[in-house]
Amino acid sequence: MTFHVERIDHVVLRVRDLPGMVRFYEQALGFKVERTLERLSLVQMRAGASMLDLVKGERPAAGGNMDHLCFRIEPFDRDAIVTRLAPFGISVGETVERYGAEGNGPSVYFHDPEGNQIELKGPSASATH
């Protein structure tokens, strides 16, 4: 029997300030807490079909090789993005065209409160992949 990858199931970020990062992803990006496992210092958050796990802990000495994390958003409204991130003191880069799972579409980049680079990507101009 063979298998194929359908999509990324979840991403895990190690964070120093777990409550602060939960607040950021809830208030700035609209994630909802789905499950909390206190014994693991883990909060699992959902936005649509995407799952983001935040776990309290220091970043590992080795690794740290993820460039950025991209969330597909709908609709893409730069002004709304800037407005939602401003209370967190986060500035958003210029809107650029980037290729992703659905093709080319508008994207902006910023860093979350712990320095992870985040891309918010809007819909592609066409439905072709």
Annotated model-derived regions:
Residues 1-19, 68-69, 73, 124-129:
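N-terminal beta-strand motif that seeds the catalytic metal site of vicinal oxygen chelate
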Residues 19-32:
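Amphipathic alpha-helical segments
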Residues 32-65, 75, 117-122:
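Conserved short beta-strand elements that form part of the metal-binding/catalytic scaffold
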Residues 5-7, 62-66, 102:
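Short glycine-enriched loop/turn motifs at secondary-structure junctions
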Residues 30-36, 91-96:
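Short secondary-structure junctions
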Residues 18, 69-117:
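Vicinal oxygen chelate
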